[in-house]
Amino acid sequence: MNLVERFLKYVSFDTQSDELTRLTPSTPGQMVFAEYLKSELESLGLEDITLDENGYLFATLPANTEKELPVIGFIAHMDTSPDMSGKNVTPRIVEKYDGSDIVLCAEENIVLSPSQFPELLDHKGEDLIVTNGKTLLGADDKAGIAEIVSAVVYLQEHPEIKHGKIRIGFNPDEEIGEGAHKFDVQKFGCEWAYTMDGGEVGELEFENFNAAAAKITFKGRNVHPGYAKHKMINSIRIANQFITMLPRHETPEHTSGYEGFYHLIGIQGDVEQSTVSYIIRDHDRNKFEDRKKEIEHLVNKINAEFGEGTATLELRDQYYNMREKIEPVMHIIDTAFAAMEAVGVKPNVKPIRGGTDGAQLSFKGLPCPNIFAGGLNFHGRYEFVPIQNMEKAMKVIVKIAELVASK
């Protein structure tokens, strides 16, 4: 199989993750896909292939030189986002895209248009893999998996390219924030690694959000509305008051770059009890801590007004900015930067407005910045990936291996 054939095969597996199951992997389809990948890696003759009960698949491409070299790794995740169906994905290749609207689903009038997604125009003349408008595509992150496997095959077929020992790792449940939780860094055995999980060509990322989740529960008192004066306490109104106390412009839709936010992701409730759920994000660790303190302060303020115990807070950290773990080993960024330039890709170093498995792995002792996989519009029906983007990502992997061996 070539790179494109491999990718088209991979997206046929339904691997949506599900945070509600509390299992690892969170869905059985991920293990089905992992078993398929394991058999493919075996057929390629890779070594030290292991697939554990949690769905973590590791393998080794042995060194083809006697030179003492660091062991490096490439990592991608097998799950797709729970935000949109990944079942019965039906991809289509739009050859030599001409810049016009792409009809994904005529009967439902679902159109991928440059008027809504202007980044399409950056890929005129290229070959785009798109959806049928009814599912996501799964380039996040099956493009990354296809690129890693295809790069390994390329290195096998070109023994003149010298490289050290390379480890590859495919993990479940990145999309629900648990991809690194049971990743055995010691078993993986690398000095450093790269996740192939970025978007547009050139993306090179080693800064991400510090992240926390907050759940605030508001207690009320329900009384027949006809006789409720001075008796009823409506928890929905208290929840609404809390929501309005947070800065209205410090939200995802009003921020970019290094700006942090509070993101209201869920509301449930009735008069008796209501719950609001937030995610809290900031690149700056001090500002991140201040945001958490502000949530705590507002909860205390609600309790001061309505009585102690009216509002209860569950607050937990999710992950931290990997920059502090990458800065001491900036040569791994320099290597990726040089590899991109060597294959004609202009590096675009920027902060991740999110998190990656690599962020958590970095704090577990495996420095792990993120490199582009080439897809765009992740997590929805408008997701697409230019074939040329995937080819460039594959070339970057090969070049990194070559550069590490040349030093």
From Swiss-Prot:
Its cofactor is Zn(2+). GO terms for cellular component: cytosol. Zn(2+) 1 binds at H77, D140, D197. Its EC number is 3.4.11.4. Belongs to the peptidase M20B family. It comes from Bacteroides fragilis (strain ATCC 25285 / DSM 2151 / CCUG 4856 / JCM 11019 / LMG 10263 / NCTC 9343 / Onslow / VPI 2553 / EN-2). Keywords: Aminopeptidase, Cytoplasm, Hydrolase, Metal-binding, Metalloprotease, Protease, Zinc. This is Peptidase T. It is found in: Cytoplasm. Zn(2+) 2 binds at D140, E175, H379. It is an enzyme of class 3 (hydrolase).
